[in-house]
């Protein structure tokens, strides 16, 4: 990882979901690649006041643990996320097995608490083939995400397993 261009670390998620759904008054298209972001050095630096280079080193030291697939459990929250450039996505928030314990170890090694990321999977986009929208801190969730109402959330969650 180059500290001048810190890399986000992710693990892939395999889900059998439809290529197109209708929810929240729009048609949405499946993302070609599904993942959970586990570690974003630049956003963690801003949220924790830790040095980005120290976070990059910690990410490298724990890369295998941060990028290996883990069990996830969708928690029932689904949100529409909007970027300033007009892109829109649908995300399902999830719990990630063992990520809290890993973050405790990372925090101990860095000598400061690291906030857990708001773990989620970006499932669909408003434009076919569009990328995701950064959602790696609670502040970004508050600024960019709007929870779907129960009926629309159920329409999305109906395609997801409780545990992946």
Q: What name fits each language-model region?
A:
Residues 1-164:
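Histidine-dependent nucleotide/RNA phosphoesterase domain, centered on the 2H-phosphoesterase fold
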